[in-house]
Amino acid sequence: MSRTPPSRWNRLDRWMVSFMAAYGIKLLRISVAIIFIWFGALKVIGRSPVYELISRTVYWVSPEFFVPFLGVWEIVVGVGLLCRLALRLTLLLFWLQLAGTFLVLLLRPDIAFQFGNPLLLTTEGEFVIKNLVLIASGLVIGSTVERT
């Protein structure tokens, strides 16, 4: 019995899967790096749309100090991801920053949820919950750190 040649669709499918396997994690790392650098830079220059959210959540620290500090932290994470510099340390800073983003859910649920209902997110709540995607991204990126 002769084998039929793969269809164009199957060849395209194999090529796409091969491309994603070869470049997916690298592009994910670069994309997350861009997000951290961009969002961090906005905090440093005082143009972040989450300035008020941060200042209302981390109310025990002066926002004039903390927001730019957080911005520098995020830029460091972004550059570390982009250049694969001290990736273990970079990922530690990444995890600490992401853990901090969920503080609003615990400390200021009135900001994150409508009418106190955890199923009804506010815009700020959606902003925080979307960080679940960044957590998953961090897990994938972290899986590429070679053991020493």
Where does each model-flagged region fall?
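Membrane-interface extramembranous regions
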Residues: 1-148
